[in-house]
């Protein structure tokens, strides 16, 4: 679950960068 939490933070910064 900790990994997912970290991923969310990264996604927030990238937003469309990852997706």
From Swiss-Prot:
Record-level Gene Ontology MF annotations: toxin activity
Tissues expressing the protein: Expressed by the venom gland.
Domain of life, source organism: Eukaryota
Protein localization: Secreted
Main localization (coarse): secreted
Assigned keywords, A-Z: Neurotoxin, Secreted, Toxin
Keyword Disulfide bond: no
Cellular component, GO annotation: extracellular region
Family the UniProt entry places it in: Belongs to the scolopendra toxin 3 family.
Protein name: Scolopendra 5848.46 Da toxin
Source organism of this protein record: Scolopendra angulata
Lineage of the species this protein comes from: Eukaryota, Metazoa, Ecdysozoa, Arthropoda, Myriapoda
